[in-house]
Amino acid sequence: MLRIKALAPLQTRVSCWLLVLQRGHRLASIKHVCQLSERKRQSLLYPFSDLEGHLFSQVNQAQFKIFHPSLEELRQAETLFTPSSKHVINYSTSAVRMDHVPILKQPEVCFMGRSNVGKSSLIRALFSLAPEVEVRVSKTPGHTKKLNFFTVGKAFTLVDMPGYGHMAPQDFVEMVEPYLQERHNLARTFLLVDASAGLQSTDLVAVEMFEEFNLPYVLVVTKIDRTRQGALLALALELQDFIKKQTTACFPQPFLVSSVQFSGIHLLRCFIAHVTGKQLLSAKQS
C-alpha cells in the first residue's frame, strides 16, 4: 500500500441532507480568473506549475502536462458548464440498483472515492456556474446508498457514486460493480484521492476493479490546499510512478484540485469536455 507523509486531514461533518450552492465561487468563471496576476492565474488553472520549481532537472515534467489546454480551450469548455434555456444543468434522478438506473444515450462520467474525500464539494465546484444544481449529501458521512445522476444539457451525464471505505454501506460492491461493467456509455471514471492521505488500500481495490474491467479512469487529488507543497509534490510523483508501473487503463497524468481555492477546477472541466467528445483539443492525449 502506498503511503505519503502529509498533513492530517481536517475533519468535516455534514449536518444536513441537502446542500444547495447559493452562489457561485468568485473564481468560477475564466473572465474573473483572468483578472488575477499571471502567477496566480497559472497556479489556479494549472496547479502543477506551483510544484515545478521544486523538481530536480532530471525529472520528466512532461508527464504532468500531457493534458495542458490553452486559455481559449478552457474558455470553450466553460460554456459546457454554463446553463441556459436550451442547455439545462440539473440533478436528474437517483438509483439504488441497476434496474433503477435511467437509460440515457449521452456519454457519462462518474466520480468515485473514499468517504469524506471531498467528492460532493468537487461536484459543486464543477457546477458552480449553475448554482441551482442540488448536490445531495447523506446526514452521516459514508452512508450514501444511491447513485446520483446530473444531466448537463444533452451533452453528458455526471454520476455521483456512493463513497466507500470502513463507513460505506456493505452493498457498495453489489451496487457499483454492475454499473461499471454494464454501463456502455461510461466515458471515464474519476477516482478521487485525498491529498493528505494518498492512495489507501480501499482505493487500490477500486483500481483493481477498473483494471479488471479495462475501464478508462483518471486519478484526481483533492484538498490540495490542506497539504504542504513538499508533501503534495511527493504524492504527485508517487502517483505518476504508480500509474506508469502498475496500471494500464489509467490516464498517465494525475489532476490536482482544491474546491476551496478553485485550483484545477477549470482544467478538470476541460478534461471532462474532452473525454465526453464535446471538445476536440489539438495534440492532447486521452
Curated annotation (Swiss-Prot):
GO cellular component annotations of the record: mitochondrion
Keyword Lipid biosynthesis carried by entry: no
Residues holding Mg(2+): 120, 144
CC cofactor: Mg(2+)
The protein's name: GTP-binding protein 8
Span of the signal peptide: none
Positions annotated to bind GTP: 113-120, 142-146, 160-163, 222-225, 257-259
Keyword terms of this UniProt record: GTP-binding, Magnesium, Metal-binding, Nucleotide-binding
Superkingdom classification of source: Eukaryota
Entry's family note: Belongs to the TRAFAC class TrmE-Era-EngA-EngB-Septin-like GTPase superfamily. EngB GTPase family.
Pfam families to which the protein is assigned, alphabetical: MMR_HSR1
InterPro entries registered for this protein in UniProt: EngB_GTPase, G_ENGB_dom, GTP-bd, GTP-bd_ribosome_bio_YsxC, P-loop_NTPase
GO function terms (MF aspect): GTP binding; metal ion binding
Keyword Secreted: no
EngB-type G domain residues: 105-278
